[in-house]
Design a protein with these regions (language model features):
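Membrane-embedded alpha-helical bundles of multi-pass transporters/translocases
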Residues: 1-552
Length: 552
């Protein structure tokens, strides 16, 4: 095991974040392609709706755990041992994490398969018996994804603790390509838009089995870089002494937040299932666009900073912790506002491009946009609190934010028409995520002091100005170029969406450069430093790139 070189200040974090961002763009483009192919393959069919509902159960668990539970558990437990070069402690902790993960998730997968019918009946409001039966069959095929997700999350955390960032981003790319192939095979067998009755059991199994195969690729491909670390974890339930003291609080935090998010998910799925036939597909598409800028813009910065925050906290280096967190937070705020502006500006063309209800899709995407700010704060601040062991305050904030989603959704879905059911979900999600982000800001200030949030208000103000200006410019452009003889074709809508996104980016960067260039510079500088190094394979002085920065 090679001891990673320590990060040399905020600039190194920005460079690592730029590498992650570049790879994440490719990975998320593949993920977007997967969703686009799925939307075109199933269209507005009842089979597509039941697939979304069934796949949401294990799939959202992955999003939940990867965002804050197991992933947040692994890095803090390993950071100190990795920094100290303690190979034995790293190996023991990794083995214990894998053992506990499989011990908990394998029985859970069995229970999920056994309870597939009642679960789908609970979620599938107003669906026919044939549709519910198809959903239950697919959920049984999806059940093995749970332990596979657990393995992948632990291995991802081990790699990130060693500052190996490349493969955790490459694995989803390979998974998406695998699932795309399954979708194409399905459409070759059943045809586009096939219903439950038309597709038959064989085509249905291609759809569900191919999706689970994608999760196999997602998780087990990470064994390749793990072998390069020369770790040989063995089964066992005992953690190393240093890790043992922290694992309980982190595990409880993960369980509580997962429970809160699952409550929100269950209410969301039931509300969506009670909408129009294609409402689950609209929800799936809108959520994909919502998660795209979050994963490409906010998560890379948070992921790159996480090992530094955990190591600084373990070593008692408060200055490094606060400097790293404040700089990362400012960057995440700016990029989250940029992503929100792009969602608003491009929502209309996106809705017209896909073969679903255009108004419902556009409204849902725009409704998700404000929540991107809170979710971006979640990406960095939850990690910051977990890194310093402040699990109770993190858990309280995250739980309150997620439980606010169904509390807002229930009355909102009753007030809005059935056709706007996904819009109600999007608005409720935004309300909950903004609350979550605000509570995390309060928790971090109490735990680490106001210095950890230095400049956050300035960056938020600049981001808000840039986002409003960029979104208004895009909406003005769309009104200007709108055809007078009806709805534009799908390919015209695609061009309009791309043009809107570019305009939002240009206007946003111009405004932020004028009012807060000091926070924008590190983000842009990190990207400039990283891209030439990756293209040339060498630094400007001729020396090879540093190890431990994600280069495998």
């Amino acid at each position: 095991m090679t001891r990673p070189a320590p990060l040399a200040g905020v600039g190194r974090v920005a460079s690592a974040a730029a590498l992650i961002a570049v790879l994440t763009v490719l990975s998320r483009l593949a993920g977007f392609g997967r969703t686009a192919v799925f939307t075109w393959v199933v269209q507005d069919s009842d089979l597509g709706a039941m697939y979304v509902l069934a796949n949401a159960v294990p799939n959202i668990i992955f999003e939940i755990v990867a965002g804050g539970a197991l992933a947040s558990l692994v890095v803090p437990l390993l950071a100190g041992a990795v920094a100290a070069g303690d190979r034995q402690a790293v190996t023991a902790t990794t083995g214990a994490l894998l053992t506990w993960t499989l011990t908990l998730l394998v029985p859970l997968a069995v229970l999920l398969a056994l309870a597939a019918g009642p679960l789908i009946n609970l979620l599938g409001d107003n669906r026919s018996p044939e549709e519910l039966a198809a959903g239950a069959r697919m959920l049984r095929v999806f059940a093995p994804q749970l332990p596979l997700y657990g393995i992948g999350i632990v291995l991802t955390g081990v790699l990130q603790a060693h500052r190996r960032f490349a493969w955790p981003v490459i694995a989803p790319l390979l998974s998406s390509l695998t699932v795309i192939v399954a979708y194409l095979v399905f459409v070759g067998v059943a045809g586009p838009g096939a219903s439950v009755a038309q597709a038959g059991r064989g085509a249905e199994l291609i759809l569900s089995g191919g999706t689970t195969l994608g999760v196999v690729v997602l998780s087990l491909s990470l064994l390749i870089p793990i072998r390069r670390l020369r770790l040989r974890p063995r089964p066992g339930y005992t953690f190393a002494a240093d890790a043992r003291a922290r694992v309980g609080g982190l595990a409880v935090a993960g369980v509580v937040t997962v429970t809160a998010q699952q409550v929100a998910l269950a209410v969301i799925l039931r509300r969506v299932a009670g909408g129009l036939t294609e409402a689950p597909q609209v929800f799936n598409l809108a959520q994909t666009f919502y998660l795209l800028p979050w994963a490409v813009l906010a998560v890379p910065l948070a992921t790159a900073a996480y090992p530094t925050l955990a190591a600084a906290s373990a070593e008692g280096d408060e200055r490094s912790y606060r400097d790293t967190l404040s700089a990362t937070l400012r960057g995440v705020l700016l990029l989250s506002f940029l992503g929100a502006a792009v969602l608003v500006g491009a929502a209309g063309p996106i809705g017209r491009f896909f073969p679903l209800n255009a108004e419902a899709t556009a409204g849902a995407i725009a409704g998700y946009a404000p929540g991107l700010i809170g979710y971006g704060l979640f990406a960095v601040l939850s990690r910051a609190l977990y890194a310093r062991g402040a699990t109770r305050s993190a858990t309280a904030a995250i739980t309150a934010g997620w439980l606010a989603v169904p509390l807002v959704l229930l009355p909102l879905s009753a007030l809005l028409p059935v056709a706007d059911r996904v819009l109600a979900v999007a608005l409720a999600n935004s309300a909950g995520m903004l609350l979550l982000g605000g509570l995390l800001l309060v928790a971090v200030r109490r735990a680490a002091g106001s210095a950890a949030l230095a400049g956050a208000a300035r960056a938020a103000g600049a981001g808000l100005l840039g986002a409003v200006a960029g979104a208004l410019a895009a909406l003005w452009l769309l009104r200007l170029v709108a055809q007078g003889d009806g709805t534009p074709t799908r390919w015209v809508a695609l061009g309009q969406g791309m043009l809107s996104g570019v305009l939002v980016g240009v206007v946003f960067l111009a405004v932020v450069w004028l009012v807060d260039r000091r926070d924008l510079r590190p983000v842009l500088a990190g990207l400039r430093r990283r891209l030439p190094a990756r293209l040339r394979g060498r630094q400007k002085d001729g020396s090879p790139p540093e190890q431990g920065d994600g280069k495998e």
